[in-house]
Amino acid sequence: PVRVEARVKERFFLNYCTFGYTMPWWGWNEWERFIDWMALNGVTMPLAITGQEAVWQKVWRSHGLTDEEIRSYFTGPAHLAWHRMSNIDGFDGPLPQGWIDAQVELQKKILERERSLNMKPVLPAFSGHVPSQIKEIYPSAQITRVKGWAGFPEENLCHFLAPMDSLYHRIQREFLEEQTRLFGTDHIYGVDLFNEVEAPSWDPQTLAEISRGAY
């Protein structure tokens, strides 16, 4: 047998993009093999973002959106990683309800396996990415439209709710509570506020306020 000791206690693995290549089409057989491979290679903190659309469905419903509006806000499965990174909305959608439901059951299996191997899954949290209807429902909220990404048309651009706004904290709490109800938690979360997109402002003070609000 070969034994290698890591220099650090925790080893984080994966990023949002890796969930957008072949992973959208993985079933449990692929995931089980991959999780076992991660365990053999000393991964302790795998990113685990599968199934979050069901959580968002419940959150956005509570704010008055219809199921049709919510599923049309999501992209299709092949582009969902970039929707989760706040790059694009709606492209190749709406997201099928059957796919959303199946991903919940898959995520439960993923998390059970990872935790059984002493891993601490890193779950998603709210980055400020909201459907366009939220700006109509809450006209006074600090919501801005994200500038273009990768040449996608204006209809696919995202909206960003500033973490300094009280609505951000309300949505964050609602999301984490529902996610914990569905999937449990290891109290470790990953949030990428501006992935390949422009921040509303590059003023250092504003960026500091955004970071504090998200944290």
Where are each of the predicted segments found?
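Aromatic-lined carbohydrate-binding surfaces of glycoside hydrolases
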Residues: V4-Y215
